Amino acid sequence: MLAKRIIPCLDVTAGRVVKGVNFLGLRDAGDPVEIARRYNEQGADELTFLDITASSDQRDIILHVIEAVADQVFIPLTVGGGVRSIADIRRLLNAGADKVSINTAAVTHPEFVQQASEHFGNQCIVVALDAKAVTPENDRWEIFTHGGRNRTGLDAVEWARKMQQLGAGEILLTSMDRDGTKAGFNLPLTRAVSDAVNIPVIASGGVGNLQHLVDGVKEGHADAVLAASIFHFGEYTVDQAKQAMRAAGIEVRL
């Protein structure tokens, strides 16, 4: 059994790490290079770096920040935000990213995922799904784009399957209902997507304590768990998270 991964997430806008609730109300969490270095030292398995306003205001990705982060970090680095072309992916990989996350462009041009996968190999293509419940029972979820502002009408589980078929090597699944709330992952959503595909699924959105990370793996069937605010603001360290997962019988790299 593969070890489950713990992945701190750096949401970056205007060169600063920020954290909001339900994609709004952003709070400054610090300098991305300093934060990335700290997580590297704490033993994070990977880092995810999302330029959260790149798609919505059509800004080019801040390559100099990525280069500075990649220079300090010796664990796999996934970078996303405003990725719209093969040239964008090449620039990010050249700047030091190990994997590139495609979100809005996967919806507007699904064939782009296939082109990217054929060009660079599916091991470095992550498709990010921002999903939100569209029923009161929390049993159906749809994909939203542009930082959660645009509803697409696409069913999240079906979309994950399609992305796998087109060559995604990994799914980064964010529950927008839970993002920043600290109420825990949306476990029915996480489980439905994880069980529908046979590529790794990273659960994101809602972590408020270490038990939530455990639940994401045990109940959500996720291959990796991503968190931001519990790490950024010093509530827990990555090592504490790994110890909690290990105590719950989950294999992790210590």
UniProtKB/Swiss-Prot annotation:
Catalysed reactions, as listed in the record: 5-[(5-phospho-1-deoxy-D-ribulos-1-ylimino)methylamino]-1-(5-phospho-beta-D-ribosyl)imidazole-4-carboxamide + L-glutamine = D-erythro-1-(imidazol-4-yl)glycerol 3-phosphate + 5-amino-1-(5-phospho-beta-D-ribosyl)imidazole-4-carboxamide + L-glutamate + H(+)
Active site, per annotation: D11, D130
GO BP: L-histidine biosynthetic process
Pathway annotation: Amino-acid biosynthesis; L-histidine biosynthesis; L-histidine from 5-phospho-alpha-D-ribose 1-diphosphate: step 5/9
EC number: 4.3.2.10
Coiled-coil annotated spans: none
Keywords, comma-separated and alphabetical: Amino-acid biosynthesis, Cytoplasm, Histidine biosynthesis, Lyase
Example of a GO cellular component annotation carried by this entry: cytoplasm
Cross-referenced CDD domains: HisF
InterPro entries on file: Aldolase_TIM, His_biosynth, HisF, IGPS_HisA/HisF, RibuloseP-bd_barrel
Signal sequence, start to end: none
Xref: Pfam families: His_biosynth
Gene Ontology molecular-function annotations: imidazoleglycerol-phosphate synthase activity; lyase activity
Compartments in which it is found: Cytoplasm
Subunit structure: Heterodimer of HisH and HisF.
NCBIfam families (alphabetical): hisF
Function: IGPS catalyzes the conversion of PRFAR and glutamine to IGP, AICAR and glutamate. The HisF subunit catalyzes the cyclization activity that produces IGP and AICAR from PRFAR using the ammonia provided by the HisH subunit.
PANTHER family: IMIDAZOLE GLYCEROL PHOSPHATE SYNTHASE HISHF, IMIDAZOLE GLYCEROL PHOSPHATE SYNTHASE SUBUNIT HISF/H IGP SYNTHASE SUBUNIT HISF/H
Family per record: Belongs to the HisA/HisF family.
Protein name, UniProt field: Imidazole glycerol phosphate synthase subunit HisF
Source organism of this protein record: Chromobacterium violaceum (strain ATCC 12472 / DSM 30191 / JCM 1249 / CCUG 213 / NBRC 12614 / NCIMB 9131 / NCTC 9757 / MK)
Gene name of this polypeptide: hisF
